[in-house]
Amino acid sequence: MHTPFIVALDFPSKQEVERFLRPFAGTPLFVKVGMELYYQEGPAIVAFLKEQGHAVFLDLKLHDIPNTVKQAMKGLARVGADLVNVHAAGGRRMMEAAIEGLDAGTPSGRMRPRCIAVTQLTSTDERMLHEELWISRPLVETVAHYAALAKESGLDGVVCSANEAAFIKERCGASFLAVTPGIRFADDAAHDQVRVVTPRKARALGSDYIVIGRSLTRAADPLRTYARLQHEWNGGERESTTPT
């Protein structure tokens, strides 16, 4: 988990994943496998990506009763993912159970996968929070509460907007991971996400990792776009033509 860039492999099949990754042959990436791909291909897709030398964020956002989450995480620990997640809204006991499952399922001699919590989806805005989810607190307070709860439950970090990263770090400590989706270049469309930022702004605001999907996976030249991502993250200090 060295590179700060997490590439969202939002594809329906292994064949499309292979096609996208072909230009990056020999370059280890940090990739995200979400529901769409995992539910089609199963654990084999994680094994395939690990064989290719990539780190894997298995983004399934578990949210169920504690024992179910514990048993599920026990299984996911054996799959080989480097990072997994749950919904913080599942509560303290569920998040503690997730860690228990990961500890129990991680093979001897291997580090357990890091586990982070989703605070609020980046498609959630204040109106949706209050009118549809019936949460009366402001969005920023809700995110802060969920982040603190995740920290107290033994998790390694949270998924959050870059705009929330700084105060989460203040509340939970610098080592508590802030993983930020909703990353777009300045000239991209926001699509179905509301709280979006550029790579450069995400770094300035304190994000440890940024998740980039359509801006990269649907680019005409993914390799060049990845280089642009590096360039923006580095504040324009240098630009690489080959991913590192």
Curated annotation (Swiss-Prot):
Substrate binds at residues 10, 32, 59-68, 122, 184, 193, 213-214. It comes from Geobacillus kaustophilus (strain HTA426). The active site is at K61. The gene is pyrF. One of its GO terms (cellular component) is cytosol. Its EC number is 4.1.1.23. This is Orotidine 5'-phosphate decarboxylase. Belongs to the OMP decarboxylase family. Type 1 subfamily. HAMAP family: OMPdecase_type1_B. Homodimer. The keyword Lyase applies.
